């Protein structure tokens, strides 16, 4: 029988924290270091689990404070919290309601469904910040690049090109920072090397996996596929059966895996044959690419889980490397 858990639900904002304590009392405090410290000390005295939603960079200081004081913390999925609130008839959405729903949703989950935040190394923290910065710079570059038109006047075009050149330099610097963060940590460096031994997996996918999935290797095949958003999800109702389609998943990881699948379907001998077999059997090309991206996600997770695991190599390349020549066997007299 599941025992009742003490939960502190927190709705995190840029400037404010809305808190719902285990006894139902609510607080509205500033999102500053001193206020966060007082709040986590209070949670530690209560022996409570601190729960909050993923909000980009704003919940990171709160998570670090929990880890520093050995307080268990859980980062919940905002989609699940919202669906839980609607199931309780709470259609309104305010910060005060959100912190209460976060507390109630976490309390309703089984103990094994609460995935506690694990401490990150300094290299992992730097890598995560650099990957996020690179993403924002690429977004800014795309906005400026899309402003070029055929009838653009020369002066405006000059300003836009100057901005693009500046962004390109900054993107290169941030990518160098990502590589430096990986090189400074032995575990990250080894995983990066092993990931990139797989044809189709490049530096972009490797950085995103190491930055956004510090617990890579702890999943089974179904869990990693669902987390990456490339697992087919069944949708049935009585006699109606819809096509199983991937749903949700981590957006950045999903995009990076898809582009890796495009590369692997051309350059990776094993995955290319898998892709071509699916297309030959009538699967649409995008569905086949999604299946390839799922294979890559499972392969990366297996590499991280088993230090001695080595993915299968291209048999043609292996034969060349070993100097073996295939031909008809000689008859022995």
Where are these regions (language model features)?
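Short helix-capping/linker segments at secondary-structure and domain boundaries
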Residues: 109-114, 144, 214-218, 264-270, ...
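Short low-complexity, flexible loop/linker segments enriched in glycine and/or proline
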Residues: 88-92, 248-250, 302
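Amphipathic alpha-helical interaction segments
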Residues: 101, 159-162, 166, 208, ...
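Phosphate-backbone recognition surface of nucleic-acid-processing proteins
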Residues: 28-29, 34, 203, 207-281, ...
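Low-complexity, acidic/Ser/Thr- and charged residue-rich accessory regions of DNA metabolism proteins
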Residues: 238-239, 243, 274-333
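Helix-hairpin-helix/helix-loop-helix acidic hairpins
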Residues: 148-204, 213, 268
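Phosphate- and other anionic-substrate recognition elements at nucleic-acid/protein interfaces
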Residues: 1-158, 165-168
């Amino acid at each position: 029988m599941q025992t009742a858990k003490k939960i502190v639900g927190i709705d995190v904002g840029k400037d404010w924290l809305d808190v719902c304590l285990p006894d139902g009392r609510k607080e509205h405090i500033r999102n500053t270091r001193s206020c966060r410290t007082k709040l986590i000390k209070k949670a530690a005295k209560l022996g409570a689990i601190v729960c909050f939603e993923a909000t980009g960079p704003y919940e990171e200081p709160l998570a670090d404070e929990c880890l520093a004081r050995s307080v268990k913390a859980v980062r919940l999925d905002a989609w699940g919290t919202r669906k839980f609130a609607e199931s309780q008839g709470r259609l309104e959405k305010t910060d005060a309601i959100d912190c209460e729903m976060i507390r109630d949703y976490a309390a309703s989950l089984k103990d094994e469904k609460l995935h506690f935040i694990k401490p990150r190394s300094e290299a992992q923290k730097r890598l995560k910040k650099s990957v996020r910065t690179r993403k924002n710079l690429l977004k800014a570059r795309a906005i400026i690049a899309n402003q070029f038109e055929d009838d653009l006047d020369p002066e405006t075009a000059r300003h836009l090109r100057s901005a693009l050149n500046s962004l390109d330099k900054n993107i290169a610097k941030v990518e160098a920072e990502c590589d430096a963060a990986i090189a400074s940590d032995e575990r990250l460096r080894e995983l990066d090397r092993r990931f990139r031994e797989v044809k189709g997996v490049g530096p972009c996918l490797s950085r995103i996996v190491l930055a956004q999935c510090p617990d890579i290797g702890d999943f089974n095949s179904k869990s990693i596929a669902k987390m990456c958003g490339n697992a087919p999800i069944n949708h049935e109702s009585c006699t109606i059966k819809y096509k199983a389609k991937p749903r949700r998943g981590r957006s950045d990881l999903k995009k990076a895996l898809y582009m890796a699948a495009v590369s692997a379907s051309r350059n990776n001998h094993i995955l290319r044959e898998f892709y071509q077999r699916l297309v030959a059997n009538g699967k649409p090309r995008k569905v086949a690419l999604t299946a390839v991206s799922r294979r890559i996600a499972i392969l990366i997770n297996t590499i991280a889980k088993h230090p001695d695991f080595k993915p299968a190599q291209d048999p043609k390349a292996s034969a060349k490397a070993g100097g073996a020549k295939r031909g008809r066997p000689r008859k022995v007299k």
